[in-house]
Structures are given as C-alpha cells and as structure tokens.
C-alpha cells in the first residue's frame, strides 16, 4: 500500500491537468502542511511544466518575510485565519512566477498523521 493518500494524488493530478490546459503555473504557501501540498504536486511526472515553487512558512516571521503577511494581520487575526491565508496566497503570487496560488494554515493536532494533516485548516 502506498504511503500517500490516493485522494490527494488524484486532486493534484486534476489540478495539473487543468493548469496544463490553461497554460498556467501554480505556487503554494503552506504552514501546517509543511510542504505536503507541494510534495503531492511534485510527485506527478511533468509537474515542472505547471508548478513554480513552494513557500513553507510555518513560523509567523517566515509568513512576513517570504510571502509578505503583515505583522498587523498576524496580530489582529492570528496565523490561522482567512485574512492571513489570503495574504499568504497574494504574497506567494507576487514572489513567484505563477498564475495561481494555493495557501493553507491551520492547527496541527496530536492526532496528525504525516505532514499533510491539520486538525483545523483555513
């Protein structure tokens, strides 16, 4: 049995097919998944045609430094909030050479299994 979730692999493949048809590239900005989304994407043969780069910004200072999340938003809303995740996506688009950004933040709980699990996601 594969160590990877077939649903995640299937979703990544569907994303790749759609991006390839559009001629677009994607970037990711991840917190609680620790790069798991980018890993799922790069397991797909040919993903270099539609995947640009990943930002793993687990710490708040990394969210500010690498994808431009403001300290004010982090303090006002918290890292696990829609405004911060939207800012992560916007910042990733500005920093990358991509047409689409996928961003996620959440609370990783003690029951997590692997990097791609979050108890609570935004």
Question: Which residue stretches match the model-derived regions?
Answer:
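Short alpha-helical segments enriched in small residues
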Residues: 1-121
């Amino acid at each position: 049995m594969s160590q990877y979730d077939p649903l995640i692999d299937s979703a990544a493949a569907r994303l790749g097919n759609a991006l390839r048809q559009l001629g677009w590239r994607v970037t990711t900005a991840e917190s609680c998944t620790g790069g798991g989304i980018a890993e799922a994407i790069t397991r797909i043969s040919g993903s270099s045609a539609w995947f640009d780069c990943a930002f793993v910004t687990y710490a708040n200072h990394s969210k500010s430094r690498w994808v431009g999340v403001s300290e004010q938003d982090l303090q006002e809303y918290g890292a696990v909030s829609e405004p911060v995740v939207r800012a992560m996506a916007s910042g990733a688009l500005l920093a990358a050479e991509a047409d689409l950004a996928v961003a996620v933040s959440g609370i990783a709980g003690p029951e997590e299994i692997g990097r791609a699990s979050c108890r609570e996601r935004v």
